[in-house]
Amino acid sequence: MKKRVVSILVCMVMALGLFAGCSSSEPAGGNETTETTAAGTQAQGTAPASDLKYAVVLHALNSSFYAKMQQGAEEAGKALGIKVDVMAPTTANNLAEQISMIETCISSGYDGIATVVWDPDGFADVIKKANDAGIPVISLNQKSGKDDGVMFVGQDLEESGYMLGKYMFGQVMGGKGKYIIASCAPADSALIAREQGIKRAAKEFPEIEFVDLVDITTDLTTAVGVIENAYLAHPDVNAFLGVDVFSESIGTFIESNKLNGKVYGAGFDLTEGTLKHISNNAMQLTIGQNPFLQGYYPVMQLFTHDKFGYDLLNMNTGAFLVTKDNVSEVKPE
């Protein structure tokens, strides 16, 4: 059986039980369809039909990780028998395009919006506009980092960075050495929080030294080149620590240059490539965050808010550490 964070699974089972109790007693069956639209995908299922419709506006759909969030949102829509449209900008982290999508969702009369709030200030006005129109908004995967009153479904970002740093600095690097942080979007509030967590862990190790932060972009090929250049500039660096799904590029660089065991790597998310790098000792750690649930639970929360009047809640989707000791038991996502 593939491992998952047990507490999260328990929460999911409880949630499914709750909604099963509210569903029709008619036998399962009928047609289940997923229709592709210009804005993204539209999911509808066989549960009792509802006029409610929700928009899930992601910041990107250019990796298997984001596809898992999309799948989670669509499966929630199918389970509830409601319309869920998943969409994202044509280029990753395009703030103007994402804001425009949200504004279109507001004017189109969606009953609720879930979105990735990755910029500390950029979403405040459009969220207020939605709320003024009576449309609830919940954030997923990333949050602004400010006390903006928007509930969040995702990982404890700063703490997950701390966990990564603590493991790498203590158990892998033996309390000494130099490290570089690799980020696909240095301005993202979530990635900044993880960086802060890593640096908090570093304070516990006086002989650990931060060297630099490099922008690896959201293209894996480009990312490998950026990491290589950083290594050439700092050949005495001992570890590259990623803070996002493109951490996979760290392992690619290490393995391609036969630096396994000499330079260490760590990062986030459970892509197939990253898990292979863990198995081959090109990376020593990656941390999962359950992207399926990050798509699933916002839709469920919006539904219970609109249907039954429950408040939206913060939900922690967990941090699952994967090392060489358990990588063989982990399923890519």
Each language-model region and where it sits:
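A residue-level marker of the well-folded mature domains of exported/periplasmic proteins
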Residues: 2-5, 14, 18, 22-333
